[in-house]
């Protein structure tokens, strides 16, 4: 069995080195090109999908659409879920990473970005950019909508969707594409690869590059590689 992850192509805020999180940012021109190249590469290597899962953020949805279109598979059903959203960076969202490091120190920013269990400063619920005010989350209970997350909380959010939707799809024989975000994919990778809390800090998933997992019948990783 195989599973393919793809992190969305470069976003406009990736290009500007800003914290993005749940802010809905478009793909940059480079990001659009990365998604198209990924779709072509998947087609060239014979990858076909039966279902695709993505987040409710534009940059991931757009990447998923482009990948499927470029691989002549735009007909493949897509399921969009907030559970595959990027990690919520709290009050850091929209801030310049370099300027934030100058203010708080490189080590503090590294911990906020990469540690497993350290939360960022939380966003106020009445902030104009709070997810509580975004209608795409209107169906969710208020206490479920995050104001800031670490990777541990992100995994706790993503894992129920893995167990309820993604894993059963794979086990039923479906060929699955997951088009999501750096940290939601890091969380899934931690789970399926059994990566330790310490080692996950060093895991980077590049934008727009298909990551293939070969899995056994228990969804244990046999092999992983980038196309």
From Swiss-Prot:
Site (Transition state stabilizer): 181
Catalysed conversion reaction: (2R)-2-phosphoglycerate = (2R)-3-phosphoglycerate
A single BP term in Gene Ontology: glycolytic process
Major enzyme class: isomerase
Active site: 8 (tele-phosphohistidine intermediate), 86 (proton donor/acceptor)
Residues bound to substrate: 7-14, 20-21, 59, 86-89, 97, 113-114, 182-183
Molecular-function GO terms, alphabetical: phosphoglycerate mutase activity
Keywords in alphabetical order: Gluconeogenesis, Glycolysis, Isomerase
EC annotation from Swiss-Prot or TrEMBL: 5.4.2.11
Classification via Pfam families: His_Phos_1
Pathway entry: Carbohydrate degradation; glycolysis; pyruvate from D-glyceraldehyde 3-phosphate: step 3/5
Family: Belongs to the phosphoglycerate mutase family. BPG-dependent PGAM subfamily.
NCBIfam families for this protein: pgm_1 (TIGR01258), PRK14115.1 (NF010713), PRK14118.1 (NF010716)
Task of the protein: Catalyzes the interconversion of 2-phosphoglycerate and 3-phosphoglycerate.
Binding partners and assembly: Homodimer.
Protein name per its UniProtKB record: 2,3-bisphosphoglycerate-dependent phosphoglycerate mutase
Organism of this sequence: Neisseria meningitidis serogroup A / serotype 4A (strain DSM 15465 / Z2491)
Gene name of this polypeptide: gpmA
